[in-house]
Amino acid sequence: MYKRQLFLFCGAFADFLAPYGMNDTDMLRVLEAPSLAHWMGTDHIGRDVFSRILYGAQLSVIIGFLAAGLATVISIVLGVLTGYFGGKADMLIQRFVDAWMTFPDLVLLIVVVSIVGPGVNQIVVILGCLYGIAGSRIIRGSTIAVRENMYTHAAQSMGANTLHILWFHVLPNVMPVVTVSYTHLTLPTKNEV
């Protein structure tokens, strides 16, 4: 447990903790053993290994939290809309979610990266979609429960439009589930580790 917290701390403060820049080279110190100047030694072109590990942790933390944020947005939009409106669109989207969840995440990630190309932005979008589509199922179930409550029916009978009901009645009551899902959706951070 403390390893993960240490990793997140080092990733968040890599700019302050790293003694050298990520790509600073020193050709006079190639393949140097660990010392006081270079805690984990240097690589084949004289870069400090410890600094590069810290900056790598920073990139992993950034990718993980951005992917979790995107996954949360996708799961809220899909889950609330399909859960509130229901019907054929809900059934079609849920069958797509069922099919999506049967594929292994790593295989989907490799296939999509081979199609769109490598890059940080692509990884964030792919991980966000992977976890967001699967997470929409939880939000949908909570939305269906909220939709059937009396205050939602009372708002409808008073003439409130759909957007008002979604924004002021459904979404606030789904937010506890969203919060718990977001803490669970930091799985992209764990995958990056």
Protein language model features and the residues they cover:
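Generic alpha-helical transmembrane segments of integral inner-membrane proteins
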Residues: 4-13, 65, 69, 73, ...
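N-terminal signal-anchor/first transmembrane alpha helix
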Residues: 3-23, 96, 174-175
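Generic hydrophobic transmembrane alpha-helix motif, especially the helices
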Residues: 39, 43, 49, 70-74, ...
